[in-house]
Regions:
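Bacterial N-terminal signal peptides that target proteins for export
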Residues: 6-24
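Bacterial N-terminal signal peptides
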Residues: 24-34
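Short, conserved catalytic-motif segment at the N-terminal edge
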Residues: 47-109, 129-131, 138, 146, ...
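Residue-level signal for well-ordered, solvent-exposed loop/turn and beta-edge residues enriched
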Residues: 2, 83-84, 129, 260, ...
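Sec/Tat signal peptide C-region and signal peptidase I cleavage site
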Residues: 35-39
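Catalytic loop of the DD-peptidase/beta-lactamase superfamily, centered on the K-T-G motif
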Residues: 40-84, 231, 270-708
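Short, surface-exposed loop or secondary-structure junction motifs
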Residues: 83, 92-94, 148-357, 361-362
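Active-site SXXK
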Residues: 56-62, 76, 82, 106-136, ...
Length: 708
C-alpha cells in the first residue's frame, strides 16, 4: 500500500468517527498474542465443508466495496488444500453492461507481480545460477551507478528492498494500449546517472527499481525474457492460463474495464511496462494457484528451502522500529511475513499487495494451513482488497474450527494524561516523509499537534502524552513516539489500528517521518529558488500514450514554504539548481525519493528528476488564435506546450493528428478535459486560460485549425 493511502486512511477514519458516517472514508478510498483456542497446523478433510460463511461474508463485503468505497469491480478466490472453494466477482465491467464479469476476467495485479519475480530469482538460486549474497555486478558488469557503493548491492537486497536505490524510475512506462519497452530498455542508463539513498543493506525501504533491476538480472542469467521465463516455469506448469504480461498477445475484451473520475467513458487498456515491478495481468483464481508454491501443495517448482527463505524477517537485517502489530514486515518479495490480524491468533500469514493507476490486488497466504485468498479490482485500493482477502480466510478458519471465536478489534484506549519530561519538547519541529512535510508542536502540558505543511487544509491531529512515553490520539487509534536511531536521526514512530466500517481492521507500525535539520542558504542560492516559487513546470518527455497526461501529473507546481526554509518539500536545497532528498526512512515513508536538478537550455529552464523532464512556464507560449497553424515535434522529442490566450478562449480547435502523436487539453485548474488517446476526439472547445500539449515521435506534425 502506498504511504499516502495509509495517511489518508488514518485521517479519514478519524473524521468519519467524528461525523458518524462512512462518507469520509469513502472519499479517501476512491482516491485509495496467542489465540484463545487454536488447533495445531495439520491437513484437514474439507469434503464436509460448505464454506457458506466465507461465501456469504465475501459477497456482502464485496458489494460494500463497489457500492460505497469507490471500487468499480472486483474478483476474489479462496484456495484450501489445493481446491478453489470460493470464487466470484461483482461490480461493473463495461459502461453498457454488455460484457459480463466472470472468474476469467483479467485484471492488472500491480506490485503483486513482484512475487513472481521473487520466485524466478529463487528458482535460479535453487539451480545454483544466482547466489543471493554475491554482488549483482558479478552477473551484470554493465550495471553501474554514479554512487560507487552500488558495487555492494546483492540480489537479496533487491528482493528485501534494502539496496538503497532511489525508488521508481518509470518514465514512459505507464501507457494506454502501448507495450513499448523503452522504460525497461533504458533502465540501466537511468541508474548510471543516479546516487543511492543509503548504504546498501542499511535498511529496507520500498523500491520498485530493485525489482526492475532483478528482472533484468533474471534475463541476463537465463538468456530469456522475463515473460518467457515465468510462462515456462510458473504459469504453464500451474495452468495459470489467464496470466499474461504486456509482452503477450492480450485480448483487451477479456480485461476488466477501467475508469477515472477525470473521464466519463471507459479508458483504454493499461500497460505497466516495467513488468516485474507491477505489470503482470492475472485473475484471482490464477493467483491462488500460484500461491500453492508457497504452501507446499505443488512440488518441483521451488525448493522448500527457498520458500522458507522468502518468509524470513528480512526487514530485521537493518534499521526498523520494534516489532508490533502491522501489515508491513518485509520478507523476500513479501510486504509482510507476519500479517495482522492473523498474528493475533498465532497464525503465520504472508501477503503482497499491488496498486497501479487503475488496478489493485492483494494476495494473502497461510503457509501452515495450505490456504490462500486473492482479491483483485478495477478501482479501489490494495488495502481494501486485503480486508476482503483476510476476511475470506478468517471466515474459512472459523468454519473449519481452527478459530473458535473472533478477537475484538484493538485500540490503544482513550489516553490518560501523564506529566511530560521537559526534554521531550526538543522533538518539536519540522518532519519529512511520505513525500510531505509535517509540523509538530509540543506544549508544556504534554499536548502535541501534528499539521501538514504540504496540505494545510488537512485537519490538525492532536495527541496526549501518556505514562509509557508515547503520545496517543484522542480516539486511541494511533500511538506516536520519538526515536533517535543509531544514525543520529530522529524519527516519528507511528503505531495504529485502523477500523473501516463494514470491512475490518488493519494495523500499521512504521517510522513515518524524519526530523529535518535546519538548512540556511546563502543569499544568491535563496534568490535563485525564490524566482521559482509559485511557478509551474510542464512534462515534456513522456510518450504521447502516457497515462500521466490524463492524471494531471504532467503539470508540476513549485511551492516553497516559509516555515521550512532551505527545502523544497522534503528535499534539501543543496545549490542554486539542485535539491536532494536525504531522508533515510525504512518502510514506505522514505520510498520514491528524488534528486531534483534545474538546467538552462533553448532559452528556458528545465527541471529533471527520476528520468522525467519538465519545462518552465516561460516556455509555454500562447497558441496562435488565427484560423490555421501547425507545430512539429523537434529532434529532442520534447512535447510542445501552449497556453490559451483570451483571443482563443471558446473557439473550437480541430487537430489533424499524425500517426504517432496525441494532444491533451487542461482547464485553468490543471484538470485534463481531453486526452485524444483516451477520448479519440480531435475537436475540442478551448477553455479559458487553459493549457494544450502536443506529444509524439520526432518529426510529428500537428495541423491546427480554430473557429468560433
Amino acid at each position: 500500500m502506498k504511504p499516502r493511502e495509509v495517511t489518508k486512511l488514518k485521517m479519514s477514519v478519524r473524521t468519519a468517527r467524528k461525523r458518524n458516517t462512512i462518507v469520509a472514508v469513502t472519499l479517501m478510498l476512491t482516491i485509495l498474542a496467542p489465540m484463545s483456542a487454536m488447533a495445531a497446523p495439520a491437513p484437514m478433510n474439507n469434503s464436509n465443508l460448505t464454506y457458506e460463511t466465507a461465501k456469504k461474508t465475501v459477497i456482502e463485503k464485496a458489494k460494500l466495496l463497489t457500492e460505497a468505497y469507490g471500487t468499480t469491480s472486483l474478483q476474489y478466490a479462496l484456495i484450501d488444500g489445493g481446491e478453489i472453494t470460493v470464487s466470484g466477482q461483482t461490480g461493473k465491467n463495461d459502461l453498457n453492461d454488455k460484457v459480463p464479469l466472470t472468474t476469467n476476467t483479467i485484471y492488472g495485479i500491480g506490485s503483486t507481480s513482484k512475487m513472481m519475480l521473487t520466485a524466478a530469482v529463487m528458482k535460479l538460486v535453487d539451480e545454483g545460477k544466482i547466489d543471493l549474497d554475491v554482488p549483482v555486478v558479478n552477473y551484470m558488469p554493465d550495471f553501474t551507478m554514479k554512487d560507487k557503493r552500488y558495487k555492494q548491492i546483492t540480489p537479496r537486497m533487491l528482493l528485501n528492498h534494502s539496496a538503497g536505490l532511489l525508488g521508481t524510475s518509470s518514465g514512459s512506462a505507464i501507457l494506454y494500449g502501448d507495450n513499448d519497452t523503452y522504460a525497461h530498455d533504458t533502465f540501466l542508463d537511468q541508474l548510471a546517472t543516479q546516487n543511492l539513498m543509503a548504504e546498501p543493506g542499511a535498511y529496507s525501504v520500498y523500491s520498485n527499481d530493485g525489482f526492475t533491476l532483478a528482472e533484468i538480472l533474471v534475463e541476463r542469467v537465463t538468456g530469456m525474457s522475463f515473460t518467457a521465463f515465468i510462462h515456462k516455469y510458473f504459469t504453464e506448469p500451474l495452468k495459470m492460463n489467464h496470466t499474461k504480461t504486456p509482452q503477450d498477445i492480450v485480448n483487451t475484451g477479456e480485461m476488466a474495464g477501467i475508469y477515472s473520475p477525470l473521464y466519463k467513458g471507459q479508458l483504454p487498456h493499461e500497460n505497466y511496462n516495467i513488468i516485474a515491478s507491477g505489470g503482470i495481468y492475472s485473475t484471482a483464481k490464477d493467483l491462488v494457484k500460484f500461491s500453492q508454491i508457497f504452501t507446499g501443495e505443488v512440488k518441483g517448482i521451488l525448493s522448500n528451502k527457498s520458500v522458507e527463505a522468502m518468509e524470513q524477517k528480512e526487514y530485521r537485517r537493518g534499521m526498523w522500529p520494534e516489532d508490533s502489530d502491522s501489515s508491513m514486515s518485509y520478507g523476500l518479495g513479501w510486504d509482510s511475513v507476519d500479517l495482522f490480524p492473523f498474528s493475533a491468533y498465532g497464525i503465520k500469514a504472508v501477503t503482497k499487495g499491488g496498486d497501479t493507476l487503475s488496478y489493485h490486488s492483494s494476495l494473502v497466504v497461510l503457509p501452515e494451513y495450505n490456504m490462500a485468498a486473492a482479491v483483485i479490482s478495477s478501482g479501489g485500493a490494495s488495502i481494501t482488497n486485503q480486508f476482503i482477502a483476510s476476511e475470506l480466510l478468517l471466515s474459512a478458519l472459523e468454519e473449519k474450527g481452527i478459530i473458535k471465536e473472533r478477537k475484538p478489534e484493538k485500540s490503544f484506549g482513550v489516553p490518560v494524561k501523564a506529566d511530560m519530561p521537559k526534554e521531550i519538547s526538543k522533538f518539536a519541529g519540522i518532519y519529512g516523509g511520505n513525500n510531505s512535510v509535517t509540523k509538530i508542536k509540543i506544549n508544556k502540558a504534554g499536548q502535541m499537534t501534528v499539521s501538514s505543511l504540504t496540505a494545510p487544509s488537512n485537519p490538525v491531529q492532536e495527541y496526549t502524552y501518556t505514562s509509557d512515553g508515547t503520545f496517543v490520539s484522542d480516539d486511541g487509534t494511533e500511538k506516536l513516539k520519538f526515536v533517535v536511531e543509531k544514525n543520529g536521526n530522529t524519527y516519528l514512530w507511528s503505531r495504529s489500528y485502523i477500523s473501516v466500517p463494514g470491512l475490518g481492521q488493519v494495523a500499521f507500525s512504521e517510522y513515518n517521518a524524519e526530523k529535518l535539520k535546519a538548512n540556511t542558504l546563502p543569499k544568491e542560492i535563496n534568490a535563485a529558488w525564490a524566482k521559482r516559487d509559485g511557478k509551474k513546470y510542464y512534462l515534456v518527455n513522456a510518450k504521447y500514450t502516457s497515462m500521466l497526461y490524463l492524471n494531471a501529473t504532467s503539470i508540476l507546481p513549485i511551492q516553497l514554504n516559509k516555515e521550512n526554509p532551505g527545502y523544497m518539500s522534503n528535499n534539501k536545497i543543496t545549490g542554486a539548481n539542485a535539491a536532494a532528498n536525504l531522508l533515510q526512512i525504512p518502510g514506505t515513508a522514505g520510498r520514491d525519493t528524488m534528486d531534483i536538478h534545474f538546467s538552462k537550455k533553448n532559452g528556458g529552464e528545465y527541471l529533471t528528476f527520476s528520468g522525467y523532464v519538465f519545462a518552465s512556464e516561460e516556455m509555454v507560449k500562447p497558441i496562435y488564435s488565427g484560423k490555421r497553424s501547425a507545430t512539429i515535434i523537434q529532434a529532442d522529442g520534447y512535447a510542445k506546450w501552449f497556453s490559451v490566450p483570451a483571443t482563443a478562449k471558446g473557439k473550437v480547435m480541430t487537430v489533424k493528428l499524425p500517426a504517432n502523436g496525441a494532444f491533451a487539453i487542461y482547464d485553468q485548474n490543471g484538470i485534463c478535459i481531453n486526452h485524444s488517446v483516451v477520448s479519440g476526439k480531435n475537436v475540442v472547445v478551448l477553455p479559458e486560460n487553459g493549457r494544450i500539449v502536443f506529444a509524439g515521435e520526432v518529426g510529428s506534425q500537428f495541423e491546427i485549425s480554430l473557429k468560433k
